[in-house]
C-alpha cells in the first residue's frame, strides 16, 4: 500500500517546516505545489517531496490540484491520496497508522475527515515546542480522502470539501460513491494568533476567503460593526471563532469554551526534522509574484471539475518547464 499527500501552498512559510516534518513520516510522498509564493519553494524537493511552482495568480485550488493528480499519475501510482492544505495535519503518528486506516476502509471509495480546529497562542513558525489547543468537537467542515485502489473516478472541488465523479471524463455522466465518515478529526490550525489571521486574509482573494470568515464571525455573534480583525476580541469569542472557522450555517455552530479544548504538542518529537526543513526553507530564493491577469482569470475560470473533457482541457492549458515551473500554455 502506497500513500501520498498533495498540498497547494501560497506563502504560509510558518507552517511549511512542521507540515513536511509531520507528513513525511506518514506518507510515501508529498507533492508540494507552490502557488505564486513570494519565495520559490522548488528547492524543498527531496527524496520524499516533489515540488512544482505555479506561475499563475488566479486562485484556482481545484484546477491546480486536479492538474497535479493527473500530471503525476497519482491515481495509478498510489492507493491512498490525501489532498490537504498546509494548515491541516493528518491525525496519525506513523506509517503504520496510515496502513491501519487504509485497511479499515479497503471497501470504501471515499472517506471523510472532519476538521478539529485548533489554535496556538503565539505567532511565528510552528515548532516542536508549539502547544496547540484543539477543539474536542469536530466542526461541520469535511475533507475527502480518496482510495484510488477502489476508484479513479474523482475530481476535486472547492478545496477538496466536495468532489465530482465523472464517468470516463464525460462531464454530467457520474457515478457517485457514498463517502464514509471515519469518525476522525483532521487537525486544523487555521491561523497562528490574530496576527496570523490578518496575514491570511491579506494573502487570499476577498471573495474566496475574507467574506467567508466574516460570515462565520457574524454567525457566532460578534457584532458586524466591531473591528474584530484589526482590534482585540474576547477569549471566548476567539475560541468560538477557532472552533467554528468557516462554518456557514447557524444550526452547525459549536458552542464552546475553554473546557472544550485540549492542549497537544503535536510536533514534540520532530524538532530535528523541523529544523532541517526550516534551514532548507530559509535557503529558498525570493521569487517574482505574478499580479492579477484578466486574460488568465478568464481562461482558467472556465474550467470546472465535472465538465465534459475537463482533464483534457487542463492538460492543454497548463504546461511544465524543465525547471519545475508550471504556467499557462
Regions found by a protein language model. Name each.
Residues 21-29:
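Short, acidic, metal-binding catalytic loop of nucleotide-sugar glycosyltransferases
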Residues 34, 85:
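Conserved SAM-binding loop
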Residues 39-83, 91-92:
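Active-site-proximal specificity loops/subdomain of glycosyltransferases
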Residues 62-66, 92-299:
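Catalytic-site signature of metal-activated, phosphate-bearing donor transferases
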Residues 285-329:
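Boundary detector for helix-to-coil junctions that initiate low-complexity/charged tails
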Amino acid at each position: 500500500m502506497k500513500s501520498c499527500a498533495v498540498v497547494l501552498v501560497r506563502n504560509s512559510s510558518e507552517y511549511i517546516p512542521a507540515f513536511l516534518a509531520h507528513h513525511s513520516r506518514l506518507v510515501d510522498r508529498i507533492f508540494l505545489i507552490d502557488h505564486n509564493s513570494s519565495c520559490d519553494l522548488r528547492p524543498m524537493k527531496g527524496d520524499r517531496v516533489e515540488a512544482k511552482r505555479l506561475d499563475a495568480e488566479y486562485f484556482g485550488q481545484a484546477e491546480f490540484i486536479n492538474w497535479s493528480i493527473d500530471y503525476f499519475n497519482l491515481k495509478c501510482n498510489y492507493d491512498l491520496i490525501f489532498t490537504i492544505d498546509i494548515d491541516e495535519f493528518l491525525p496519525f503518528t506513523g506509517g503504520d497508522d496510515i496502513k491501519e486506516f487504509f485497511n479499515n476502509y479497503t471497501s470504501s471509495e471515499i472517506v471523510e475527515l472532519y476538521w478539529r480546529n485548533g489554535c496556538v497562542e503565539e505567532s511565528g513558525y510552528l515548532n516542536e515546542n508549539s502547544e496547540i489547543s484543539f477543539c474536542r468537537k469536530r466542526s461541520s467542515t469535511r475533507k475527502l480522502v480518496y482510495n484510488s485502489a477502489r476508484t479513479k473516478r474523482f475530481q476535486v472541488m472547492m478545496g477538496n470539501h466536495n468532489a465530482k465523479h465523472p464517468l470516463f471524463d464525460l462531464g454530467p455522466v457520474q457515478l457517485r460513491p457514498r463517502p464514509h465518515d471515519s469518525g476522525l478529526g483532521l487537525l486544523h490550525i487555521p491561523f497562528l494568533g490574530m496576527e496570523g489571521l490578518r496575514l491570511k486574509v491579506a494573502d487570499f482573494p476577498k471573495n474566496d476567503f475574507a467574506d467567508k470568515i466574516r460570515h462565520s464571525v457574524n454567525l457566532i455573534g460578534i457584532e458586524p460593526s466591531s473591528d474584530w480583525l484589526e482590534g482585540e476580541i474576547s477569549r471566548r469569542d476567539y475560541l468560538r471563532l477557532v472552533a467554528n472557522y468557516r462554518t456557514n450555517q447557524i444550526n452547525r455552530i459549536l458552542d464552546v469554551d475553554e473546557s472544550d479544548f485540549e492542549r497537544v504538542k503535536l510536533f514534540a518529537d520532530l524538532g530535528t526534522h523541523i529544523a532541517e526543513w526550516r534551514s532548507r526553507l530559509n535557503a529558498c530564493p525570493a521569487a517574482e509574484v505574478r499580479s492579477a491577469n484578466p486574460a488568465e482569470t478568464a481562461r482558467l475560470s472556465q474550467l470546472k471539475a465535472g465538465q465534459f473533457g475537463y482533464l483534457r482541457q487542463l492538460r492543454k492549458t497548463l504546461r511544465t518547464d524543465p525547471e519545475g515551473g508550471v504556467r499557462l500554455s
